[in-house]
Amino acid sequence: MSLPLTEEQRKKIEENRQKALARRAEKLWAEQPQSTASGSSAARPSQCKQNSLLNLPAEPSKPEGHATISKGQNLNNSLPAAQRPHSSPCFQPSTAEEAKGLWKSEGKMSAACPNPSPPEVSNQQLLGSKSSEGHPQATQDTAASCPRPFPRDPKLEAKAGRPSTSGQSISDTFYALGEKTPKTDGRPAKALQTSPQKASCLRGMCLRTGDRFRVKIGYNKELIEVFKSLPSRRYDSFTKTWDFSMSDYRALMKAVERLSTVSLQPLEEVDGTGGQTSLPSAPSLTFVTGRCMLISRARFEVDIGYSEVVIALFKQMESRNYDPKTRKWNFLLEEHNKLIARSRELKQVQLDPLPKTLTLAFASQLEKTSLQSKADVPEADLSGVDAKLVSNLMPFQREGVSFAISKRGRLLLADDMGLGKTIQAICIAAFYRKEWPLLVVVPSSVRFTWEQAFLRWLPSLSPEDINVVVTGKGRLTAGLVNIVSFDLLSKLEKQLKTPFKVVIIDESHFLKNIKTARCRAAVPILKVAKRVILLSGTPAMSRPAELYTQIIAVKPTFFPQFHAFGLRYCDAKRLPWGWDYSGSSNLGELKLLLEEAVMLRRLKSDVLSQLPAKQRKMVVVNPGRISTRAKAALDAAAKEMTKDKTKQQQKEALLVFFNRTAEAKIPCVIEYILDLLESGREKFLVFAHHKVLLDAIAKELERKNVQHIRIDGSTPSADREDLCQQFQLSKGHTVAVLSITAANMGLTFSSADLVVFAELFWNPGVLIQAEDRVHRIGQTNSVGIHYLVAKGTADDYLWPLIQEKIKVLGEAGLSETNFSEMTEATDYLYKDPKQKTIYSLFQQSFEDDGNDMEFLEAAESFELGSTSGTSGNSSQELGDITDENALADSPPKKRRFEFFDNWDSFTSPF
């Protein structure tokens, strides 16, 4: 809907229209070829007759104001001799009395003058003009018989910047035949001729943009040379136009005049001297829209299209700053409300303010001119907490506790892995000990680790005060501290009627999908809890959308509707089947919002300079160790993935390919491990995912009499800490054979300095957590991390997928890890079209999977032998390395593929 025009705008438009008509009339006259002086004189009488009709005043006695004349009669010939003009070249009655006498003397005139169209010129007149060509008398007679032209308007001419002349007017030219008779003053007139129009002329125009002007024209080699000769030249490769400073305007126009093949229309608001005229420019009616975005804790940026009105508004702000790199303006937060209020007064500008969530989070910056530093958080009084715990806190850990207390015990503690989130969470919970009982929800593999941590750091607690729920029949409120796993929490919903005021959620990224059972069970608890402490080393495992549940758990009033969050931070797109929230946008603003109101995150590089950096290396294992039969199985599995199948069948084919990769890499992995032992490596970790690979590694270490431990999904939680201590205190060659998914959290192996990944995993967060089993507090050596990659396997597609996901985390400030920058030999990508197709399937399967744990369960329970029927031949392919029944050790389970991506219909439970 267009905006209504104001009275001033209508007046300006009407003035500009009149000026345009005048310029158009002058242009039409200029385009007509000039004839000789006598020819112009011959046509002049007819023109003068018409002009005399137009300039005669209406008869006073006629109410309609129309004049009447006889058809075909010459008005000058019918006038009395006394009234005919002689000395003056033109005639017009000057008074009402003279006009009345004139009309009375012409009483026989009967035809009315219908319109001011030009009269026709007879052939006799044209012949007469030719016969008198070049004679002064003919010109004088013509000039003497010409009546006075239209009365001129000196004010209009002054506005137009053109001098007033006594010759023919613009309207005179427009309504005549486009010819102009020069003033002779009794002397012979020279013939005026114009050069013929250029046959092939390149036409263009100049357009004003602020203090510069640009030229819109096609390509011309000579013109380009002229452009390059001007010092203020600037070429825009995107629009393919040249622009210059106004100081070069005159030089450009003079140079273009010398080019015979170029015609350039000048600027309308600039005269021949290069300066501006007094013509007022019409107001800009272009409607522009924009929005505000946060770029720091103190400043915000405006993303909006170009408009002179907007620029004028920006220049009214005292804190304005223009960034030439981004070509955007930014201001202090304290001027946000002022800018928005003034923008609403402009009808052609729509500027969206910062979301209400941001204005609430940064309320102090919006009201104050001074910015409060994050380091100004007051130190909390921890005198009521056990002295042993307080004395063991590092300075940055004590700052984390103070930050949490300043947020009233509601935060997402997202410190990097290995920085002691557990001890900080226990200290925060102990500060609110009067509000206990305490509920601690953790992954099942670290339940007993948390029990030992409470007994270690809080001597005031007795073992009877801690209740670890082991089965679904256990009591959730039996102790002062109650520890339960995510899976058991969903089975104890009936016992959740008694609210907990203090809740700790370890690895809170497990709650990334509201559709899962564990999330539905945890959300009601967090809703009624007074203190909520979320712990996560990787708060956004894959996509910013996965942060939403954690944000509303800490701040229920932030983004009550997920759609608003998705539009701003997930690059939400509407597709035929619904909204897609899998993207990411405004990650910098999201990071600032989280750090200000929800999240505290410190990286190892920020707080522990003595902690050695990780040194990653991608090792391409010898493909010759892969047997021919294994290669054939891989090729067959890859071929099955490229066929047109349903989504369920594609995921099953993907799992087959994933399992075949583990089987094919067994000889290569074992060879690499034996080489490490022979080279003098004493203690290191080996991570794998498939049971067939873990079994093969453990069997080979037993055959070589190498001391080792093994922790996988079948290892009881109570035994894992003992195995970890056994490895830490061991001497000599010791290898820890670990499952990527079962031993990637809650365990410390800081006595080792090398981690070997025999397999890759699609989720980079899981890989980073596994790395940090060694890269933890207490580590004094440089940590080496080796990723074993085999060409022609699933590694071809998993490695670039990991790099892409870790890049998104880095942009959001949620990971300091960059596989591309910190890993040696990263140029390992798919090459042929078939590989690209398979990579797309990997990417779609793992990104569309709303819950990695559901897909992980399907991968763990997938029985390769029941699908391929080749378990009996596997031992022959692998020689002495594998057991005959290695592929059939896992009990068959029901395959499950559950995906939860229906974010568009989700509304915050708060």
From Swiss-Prot:
Annotated GO biological process: DNA damage response; DNA repair; double-strand break repair via nonhomologous end joining; regulation of transcription by RNA polymerase II; replication fork processing
Post-translational modification: DNA damage-regulated phosphorylation by kinases that may include ATM, ATR and PRKDC.
UniProt keyword terms in alphabetical order: Acetylation, Coiled coil, Hydrolase, Nucleus, Phosphoprotein, Repeat
Cellular component terms per the entry's GO annotation: DNA replication factor A complex; nuclear replication fork; nucleoplasm; nucleus; site of double-strand break
Subunit structure, interactors included: Interacts with RPA2; the interaction is direct and mediates the recruitment by the RPA complex of SMARCAL1 to sites of DNA damage.
UniProt function note: ATP-dependent annealing helicase that binds selectively to fork DNA relative to ssDNA or dsDNA and catalyzes the rewinding of the stably unwound DNA. Rewinds single-stranded DNA bubbles that are stably bound by replication protein A (RPA). Acts throughout the genome to reanneal stably unwound DNA, performing the opposite reaction of many enzymes, such as helicases and polymerases, that unwind DNA. May play an important role in DNA damage response by acting at stalled replication forks.
Protein name: SWI/SNF-related matrix-associated actin-dependent regulator of chromatin subfamily A-like protein 1
